[in-house]
């Protein structure tokens, strides 16, 4: 285990440099994520739902190929990660990026919300930003810290559960408002630098809010990424900073 506070990213126009408590190494969590991702792929392949929509897979791969090189703005090591991009055919409205760059999109998110390439890029940039900031590692560290306090008080009867952290945990992780704000900001910048219109962040979240209306159970993506008006307002406030990056990318600069 590692102890202490650090920041996982730096630089960028709207990046984040908040200090984070980390009590588990990146290598440990990345290995866990890689194993979980491999199991998810195997389970999905066995069900015949992995990468069956070749057109959508090609589309998602093309967008990822433009965004991944931009991650070096925030982390010099990130472009060299062992990136993976796959698509599960499912009506589920979800997408995520596990630690270390393991990306998964569900076809329902794109099909049911009729996402444009710009909107897909916003989703992808947001999810990648969670991985860049190592929000999952931070959450595990907070759980470890809480257990250590309970141990000192003699109140905890359970194990830490870190070893049992499976892909269901990575998929269903509910990040804090601070985490979500950081991912929104950095995701906008990543997509803009890759030549995708950051204004799509506004249309995307309006679509998300519409999808959540009249539903007794919110879509999977919204259960972990709540769509709120103030979230849209924050994105709108960032557009003057990231639009020049998009315009420069479109000019090929």
Sequence positions of predicted segments:
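A Zn2+-metalloprotease active-site environment signal
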Residues: 3-253
């Amino acid at each position: 285990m590692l102890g202490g506070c650090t920041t996982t990213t730096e630089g960028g126009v709207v990046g984040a440099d908040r200090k984070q408590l980390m009590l588990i190494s990146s290598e440990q969590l990345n290995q866990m994520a890689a194993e979980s991702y491999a199991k998810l792929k195997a389970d999905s392949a066995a069900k015949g739902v992995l990468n069956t929509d070749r057109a959508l897979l090609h589309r998602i791969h093309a967008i990822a190929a433009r965004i991944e090189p931009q991650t070096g703005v925030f982390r010099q090591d990130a472009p060299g990660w062992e990136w993976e991009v796959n698509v599960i055919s499912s009506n589920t409205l979800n997408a995520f990026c596990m630690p270390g760059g393991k990306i998964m999109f569900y076809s329902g998110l794109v099909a049911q919300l009729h996402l444009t390439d710009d909107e897909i890029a916003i989703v992808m940039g947001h999810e990648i930003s969670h991985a860049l900031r190592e929000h999952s590692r931070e959450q595990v560290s907070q759980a470890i810290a809480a257990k250590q306090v309970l141990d000192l008080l003699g109140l905890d009867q359970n194990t830490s559960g870190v070893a049992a952290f499976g892909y269901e945990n990575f998929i269903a992780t509910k990040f804090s408002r601070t985490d979500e704000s950081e991912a929104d900001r950095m995701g906008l910048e990543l997509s803009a630098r890759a030549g995708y219109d950051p204004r799509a962040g506004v249309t995307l979240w309006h679509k998300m809010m519409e999808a959540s209306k009249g539903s007794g159970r919110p879509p999977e993506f919204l259960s972990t990424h709540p769509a709120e008006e103030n979230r849209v307002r924050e994105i709108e406030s960032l557009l003057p900073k990231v639009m020049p990056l998009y315009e420069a990318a479109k000019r090929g600069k």
